[in-house]
């Protein structure tokens, strides 16, 4: 045990020493984080969570969410005021602020600041680029079929050899002047504005894109709160405060002095990509990271029986936040596979055999069992509804196997056990444990599971090509509306967010009917009816909604749980004096102390 603790202390010391390297001129206002692996800093390509969140630090969007308002509320970001909607409910008029500038960068060749001003032309260019078929933007779903002419533009670009179509534009994006533009929708869509707050819809500089070319994804030039100082792939990103960021304040800041300071409050953010969870954990304990998630394997050392922080960590000045996530986890069936698509009874049997209680144990209780795709707290989630196929019941599952023509799991064509593949997007011990649970559950009804543990690249390649049978995945909501989760079953989204390739004319009819509906009890009732309908078709095994546990040191200020605070870092601050004082008293904690023994 002593050797283990000594080794862990050495690892911590190594990371602690690296924190000081290149940490900047003013470490007092520097925040240190462990971030996920960033693939790209191109907003139109940043479909993964780590990239999306990082993009939000460098770029700005037309709208944002009020950081403290509940329920969630959209407010202007790059706009002077909320956009005006005409009587037809299809035309929005936007007016940009006049203090928006792209950050200083080599691509502007020392041009005057006024030449870096963000204009309506930049907005239109950014949105057209998402629609450019040659880019294959994975976030085109935001605009597809919603903005007049965007679908035709996408088709035309696939045949174009230059960018002349950008000059021609489309009817759905009209420039009035440098600060005013209009967006014409194909039909009323009360949720359209949500898309304009997602980092995918960030406004980029055409000049920067042309200057950097293929390396644009590594050189962000935005009008957001931070600018890139350094990016060493798979190791570290360093972000500096963007002094040209528009004037914005946070009147609810913990520190009274910070309430009068323009955002961002931090001078620097250092993001490490630490692959080993134990290294990140030890670095956090010694004050080298300002906040930390809690890994599955470390949960018992951190959280006690009453979901409270263990005494040793509480004494260290660490705070625990529990937050239900706007996320649904599920096991999907491939509806491109006739075996699964054409046999509802088989899907019912598999759903009933899946033991969610074991999954809950696997996650240390950090989840809420799901009855459908809509998370708790969202209009359309019916707390009284019970999905008939979400209750673990082996007896019923075996009966459905018989009705599916696979009695006791035997394939009548071969006389052997029905065999299905099961894909996951990771190969760690946690994924292996989940695979073992699946093998055990399906074995009880005679199905043989062949687990496929993939890296993320291979996993999503399989999903795009439909080369799978069963797969486990999650969906993190992009905006606070049930439609964002129901779209995962819409046939026109098959191959993109509809990973199961589910196609159902009746569901499509229901989905298209709710698109133009305003928020109302009637719309909420429609959502509930759609969930009940899906429960009878078993397109997924509706597994769970995640609950995240996060740890903060007390010197980190202004952290507010928020599912859509994409640019959260601009509000955060650190009390440097408190950090220095607290770290002086830190000493390595033994496993005995961590466990409160």
Briefly describe each language-model feature range.
Residues 240, 251, 341-440, 444-445, ...:
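Append "and occasionally in soluble cytosolic enzymes with long acidic Gly/Pro-rich linkers
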Residues 36-56, 106-112, 138-139, 190-201, ...:
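A structural "hinge/loop" feature
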Residues 81-142, 182, 280-283, 340-342:
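Aromatic- and charge-enriched surface segment that lines or borders ligand/interaction sites
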Residues 34-87, 221:
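N-terminal lobe/hinge region of extracytoplasmic solute-binding protein
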Residues 103, 184-203, 220-279, 303-327, ...:
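Aromatic-rich, solvent-exposed beta-strand/loop patch
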Residues 33, 284, 441-491:
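Periplasmic binding protein-like
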Residues 20, 315, 348, 352, ...:
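Extracytoplasmic/peripheral linker and loop segments enriched in polar/acidic and small residues
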Residues 121-206, 223-232:
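Surface-exposed binding/hinge segments that line
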């Amino acid at each position: 045990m002593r050797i283990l603790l000594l080794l862990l202390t050495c690892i911590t010391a190594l990371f602690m020493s690296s924190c000081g390297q290149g940490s900047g001129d003013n470490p007092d206002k520097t925040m240190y984080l462990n971030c996920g692996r960033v693939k790209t800093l191109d907003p139109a390509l940043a479909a993964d969570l780590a990239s999306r969140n990082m993009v939000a630090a460098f770029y700005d969007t037309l709208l944002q969410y009020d950081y403290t308002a509940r329920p969630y509320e959209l407010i202007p970001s790059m706009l002077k005021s909320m956009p005006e909607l005409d009587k037809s409910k299809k035309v929005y008029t936007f007016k940009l602020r006049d203090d928006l500038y792209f950050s200083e960068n080599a691509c502007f060749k020392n041009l005057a600041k006024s030449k870096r001003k963000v204009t309506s032309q930049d907005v239109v260019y950014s949105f057209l680029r998402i629609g450019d078929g040659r880019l294959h933007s994975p976030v085109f779903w935001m605009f597809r079929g919603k903005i007049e002419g965007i679908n035709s533009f996408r088709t035309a670009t696939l045949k174009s050899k230059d960018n002349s179509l950008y000059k021609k534009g489309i009817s759905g994006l009209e420039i009035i002047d440098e600060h005013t533009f209009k967006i014409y929708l194909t039909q009323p869509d009360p949720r359209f504005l949500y898309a304009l707050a997602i980092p995918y819809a960030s406004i980029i500089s055409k000049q920067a894109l042309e200057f950097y070319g293929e390396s644009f994804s590594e050189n962000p030039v935005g009008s957001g709160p931070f600018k890139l100082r350094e990016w060493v792939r798979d190791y570290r990103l360093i972000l500096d405060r963007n002094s040209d960021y528009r004037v914005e304040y946070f009147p609810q800041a913990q520190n009274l002095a910070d309430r009068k300071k323009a955002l961002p409050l931090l001078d620097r953010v250092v993001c490490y990509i630490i692959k080993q969870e134990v290294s990140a954990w030890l670095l956090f304990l010694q004050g080298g990271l300002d906040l930390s998630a809690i890994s599955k394997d470390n949960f018992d050392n951190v959280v006690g029986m009453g979901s409270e922080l263990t005494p040793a960590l509480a004494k260290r000045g660490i705070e625990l936040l529990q937050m239900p996530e706007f996320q649904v986890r599920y096991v999907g069936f491939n509806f491109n596979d006739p075996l699964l698509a054409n046999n509802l009874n088989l899907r019912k049997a598999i759903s009933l055999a899946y033991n969610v209680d074991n999954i809950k144990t696997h996650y240390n209780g950090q989840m809420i069992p799901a009855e459908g795709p809509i998370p708790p707290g969202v209009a359309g989630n019916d707390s009284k509804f019970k999905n008939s196929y979400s209750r673990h019941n082996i007896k019923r599952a075996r009966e459905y196997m018989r009705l599916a023509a696979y009695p006791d799991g035997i394939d009548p064509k071969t006389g052997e056990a029905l065999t299905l593949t099961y894909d996951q997007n990771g190969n760690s011990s946690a994924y292996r444990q989940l695979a073992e649970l699946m093998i055990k559950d399906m074995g009880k009804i005679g199905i043989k599971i062949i687990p496929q543990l993939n890296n993320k690249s291979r996993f999503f390649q399989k999903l795009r090509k439909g080369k799978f049978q069963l797969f486990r995945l999650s969906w993190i909501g992009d905006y606070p509306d049930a439609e964002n989760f129901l779209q995962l079953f819409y046939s026109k989204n098959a191959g993109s967010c509809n990973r199961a390739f589910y196609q159902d004319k009746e569901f499509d009819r229901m989905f298209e009917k709710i698109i133009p509906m305003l928020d109302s009890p009637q719309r909420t009732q429609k959502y509930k009816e759609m969930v009940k309908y899906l429960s009878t078709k078993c397109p997924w095994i509706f597994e769970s909604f995640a609950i995240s546990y996060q740890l903060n040191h007390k010197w980190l200020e202004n952290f507010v749980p928020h599912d859509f605070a994409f640019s959260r870092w601009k509000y955060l601050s650190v009390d440097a004096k408190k950090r220095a004082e607290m770290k002086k008293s830190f000493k390595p904690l033994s496993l005995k102390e961590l466990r409160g023994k």
